[in-house]
Amino acid sequence: MEKKNIGNLLVLYPKPMTVVGAEVGGKVNWLVVGHTGIIGHDRILVSMSKSHYTNQGIRKSKKLSINLVSRDMLPKADYVGSVSGASVDKSGVFDFHWGENGTP
């Protein structure tokens, strides 16, 4: 399939699989989110259920990382999307470093 130029649009299409990272209880936790989108040039939208364990860390720190999943990351992303950080330590699943703003 050939690439098609859709112009200068604020869209993520096709929708990529997205992993959100956040610090929860002193450890990194990873979550696969159901929806991400671009609201403007300076902000994005992330949609997830209020009940997710990762929300505790996001609400406390007001920080998260957005990670678009590559083909090589798929098995790990599938894993972090199928178990809860409330019962499983997912901090070692992905290699990461702390960003300047304190996000994994």
Q: Where on the chain are the PLM-derived regions?
A:
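Active-site-proximal mixed secondary-structure blocks
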Residues: 1-32, 37-104
